[in-house]
Amino acid sequence: MRVVREQPEYYEMFSTRPVPIRPFDPDSKRAALDYGARLNERLAPTGVAAELHGSLALELAGKGEWEYSLYPSPDRWYPTLTLLVNHFRGVYSMDEEVVMFNDACAGHHVEVIVLRGDAAARNRAIMQYWREHLDARADYEAGKYRHCHSKRDYYRWKDNYIADILESL
């Protein structure tokens, strides 16, 4: 698994406005799981399932968004993307290993992220790490509050924190 570290100038594109961090909300998780069930019904013909991902899945404070990760096999990559493009009527962002779709539900920003290759390996590895290391998960949550004064600083800290963990695995 290749760990990616952005150059310092990459973060200059982010604003210096604060990142609103909200405490974990169990009602939001229940609603997100319902959304995920509906998404998985739509995905059923592809044989791919969306997994709730990120802070909400870990029951941590976060930005209040709902994130879903999908890991299609190579032969299911394009059928999955085709289905999602038709459903969401477009793509938010795309590169070789990550395609992101945006939606909104019940006042929450929703990200549906399709991953493959090293990006998928990194995503799975960090979630597994946090599930197994409660102390690191608590440190991650505390760091969100320490670095939320600026979106630029928040993402610089978060990306490097995750890269440090992945390099240690």
Regions found by a protein language model. Name each.
Residues N102-N123:
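Catalytic cores of processing enzymes, dominated by hydrolases/peptidases
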Residues G54-A61, M100-D103, G117:
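Short, flexible, solvent-exposed loop/turn segments with mixed acidic/basic and small polar residues
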Residues R38-Y78:
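Active-site nucleotide-donor binding segment shared across nucleotidyl transfer reactions
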Residues E12-T16, L60-K63, A104:
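Short, flexible turn/loop "capping" segments at secondary-structure junctions
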Residues M1-E51, A163:
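Helical scaffold of the NTase/Pol beta-like nucleotidyltransferase catalytic core
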Residues P20-L39, Y71-H109:
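Metal-dependent nucleotidyltransferase catalytic core
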Residues R2, R116-L169:
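Catalytic cores of NTP-dependent nucleotidyl/adenyl transfer enzymes across multiple folds
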